[in-house]
């Protein structure tokens, strides 16, 4: 187990075959993976606003992202409602090439667990909603 102040930046996975694997549910044993994932996101903050655990080779449903300037960690996130479909383009740190066309929802309601594995519900809108949809897609093996 690492010390609290120790930062662990993990190598990124770029293989689309691996990234297309669905992730398994996360549990309390994945909290350290979430910390590594956040450290890795912060190390790439100039070019990345969100990451899923499969991007560092861990196939568990763990997501970290920048939500309007505050980093959030979500375990087992799932979208339970959405509205306001729109077309956009997104890039991905794990995929080579430029932005790709995709569709997202302006507003999403997400059920997830926090680090204590307590179930939470939260509504996200705008860019945070877009980021989170991208990362949840990663958990489900969906690539843009």
Task: Give the role of each language-model region.
Residues 1-144:
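Positively charged
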